[in-house]
Amino acid sequence: MSAAERSPLFVPPADLLLPTPEQRAIQTSTAPTLLIEARAGAAKTTTLALRLAEAWSRGALAADCLVLTYTDAAGEAFRQALAAGGVPPAAVQDFRITTFDAFAASVLLHLEGGMRVPDRTAAEALRSVVWQAVQQISDQQDERWPDALEYPSQGDAGFVAEFLDNMAWLKGTLTLQRHAPEGRLTPDDAAEMGQRYMTLRLLQAYERLRAGGHPDHPVFRGPADATYDLARLLLQQREDGIDISPEGWPARLRVLLVDEMHDMNEAMYTVLLHLLGGRGTFFTGVGDADQVIHAAAGADAGFMKGRIEQDTRRAPQVLPLKASFRFGAALARPASQFIGKPLETGGGLVTQVSVTPYADEDTCCDLVLAAVRAGRKKGAGKAAGLAILLRHEHQSIAIENALIQGGIAYRALGLESYLLRPEVLMVRGLLAIVSRDFASLSGRDTLLRLVQAFMLFCGTRFDEDPERPEAIQDQLMSDALRDFAGNAENLPMFLANHVLRKADPAAARRLRAAMAVAGEADGPQRFTRFLEALDMPWFIAQALVRPDRRAGAVRNLTGLRALASHYPDTHTFFGHLNETAVRQKGMKRSGAITLATAASVKGLEFHEVLMPYLEQGEFPYERGSPTDEANLFYVAVTRARQALRLYVHDRRPSEFVGRAGLL
């Protein structure tokens, strides 16, 4: 019996889900290795969930199933798809659904004796290691090609950001492992890999520092390092002729599923290959080549195009999933024109697509707020299905204030509320200390973030504990956070004893000047003078690594200054910030709309999608990869089911809107 004729054992309730012929073929396929080539809106995650539910109905135990995703959000979307298809909640919880990196970390935890390795995910936490690595190279006396080394100026944040970006790609692609020179790395080797010699030497030095002197576990792990470390271990085993699964590996794996396979890189693929080595493992992967948004980390849709057949004895069956049941023809047409490929629609869906021009940010915000209010009038259920998608985090300030002032509950996805961003928290903290008004900072989480903001921007370090000479700075920092994050009344003492006393003189001078202004008689210009005295861009330039993050932080403060101009004095404005923070905490989350970055909504869908600030240079971002920016726009617009509303700058419209044929 063919896959198309085979009757399914798992039949979701008709009122929940009625699978299409394409979905049924995938659900019931008997192929041990199945690859699904999908299009946006074709219910990739739902279909993969059907595949898992079918295996479960045929006797596969949850403990013998593994679902791997790129992000936590994708994993949560998969759980929701299982539940939406009628899989009992208890069964949904039993399935192991996790990210590649979390899976790798769990395996490594067993290998490393149960000792957790600290994570350092922020670029700012990795900067000092990069400079230590530069120093190591500089100190090396036996360097054979010193003229090939290009040393940066000390403190060059752009150099650090560029190296971190290069490192993410080099690790994701396993370039040094796959093209390892027989002897010592040479400039010619680097040229053959398409890299600068300095970059590769720096990566080697950085990795030695990360490994530390312990034979069993590294000092820390950065973004995706767990996957990278496990992949290297597996490659070494293969090279040594060892075919033994590491401790912590799934003992019996019957069903293996990979969602968003188009974002797979070489390190993830190496882990996948080892998982595919088990006998009797049924594998299904699904992806869409037009939704690759992690190419900077080595993501490549090519892993769905022959690599498995080339590297294993498996002969994958390839099935299509092209008909979109998320949106109608009015959205399918521009989306199809944008990617230059046909998009099929089914189910008689109707999707409204509108393009509205705006002259400035305030006007755009007003238009978005009006659309949100109109959506809320349709009921709480409709409001909960409404999403505002932003290209940049800093674009949320005016929208957040409008939502909060309008009593409209929202949940943030892929971004922090502007009130909790470090540069804004530092401003709030200084004003709170001067005014002795700690009402809005009383929450432990907020206090913790506030202390971390001072530490980030002021370079605060803690005195070594003579009773614990082995305690590293991370441990001392953790202890201090517990002490100072318990009570807002401790903030003045923290500022005096740990920030001002140990700060760089230039930083301390700016902090004291700002506090002096904050203590003067109030008036309409005091907040502006406070910001000028503080000179927050100076702190941002010293502390933050990535250019886009620095630019975003400055934009956050510009937005804060613009917001303050609507209030008669600093006291009133600070009161507004405090009231906003309190109201935000107290908002009921039922019927909340979603405020998200476009990059955070892959795998999700919404009844209505609003995309503001579509201005050339903003989206597409002028510093972004053209391909990644285009894929990100495609991902964002195809999240909509019933309505897509685009707000386009009237003088500098996004080229993407025109490319989709909507201008």
Across the structure, where does each feature detected by a protein language model lie?
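Helicase P-loop NTPase motor core
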Residues: 34-35, 40-52, 56, 313-410
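P-loop NTPase Walker
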Residues: 1-116, 333-336, 638
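C-terminal accessory regions
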Residues: 403, 571-573, 577, 613-663
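Conserved RecA-like helicase ATPase core segment
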Residues: 10, 266-354
